[in-house]
Amino acid sequence: DAFKPRKGMLGTTFGGNHLGCVAALSVIQVMKDEKLIENANEVGSYFIQKLRSLGSPLIKEIRGKGLMIGIELSIPVSPIRERLLYEHHIFTGYSGTSVLRILPPLCISRKEVDHFIDALASCINGIESRPGQSRDFL
């Protein structure tokens, strides 16, 4: 059952190592024990539903699977990302100039999703309440 390494048995630089294998097995075990894949599917569906419920005209499309979510906007995402970071302490990614990328940890809860939705709504509402003005000031 146990793997017994001996001198000369491993001979590649990039072939892996015992510590790396043990770390990977531990991660897989935690993912199973904490049901992280199930959480990603369930909370991911909830996340997308909450995003769609925002109903903002600035949101062109919401796409994703599990917790890998993209929100395509009709404006550049940089002002929203800056406000999320500096006002709400939430870091987001981006793709191109108009897609906000959301990649939270697999253990995220519905409560944390609700916190993000409230923060995003605040940022979007701040932009929508200034029609006709340059958005560079955000």
Model-identified regions with their sequence ranges:
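Conserved N-terminal phosphate-binding loop of PLP-dependent enzymes in the Aspartate aminotransferase
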Residues: 1-138
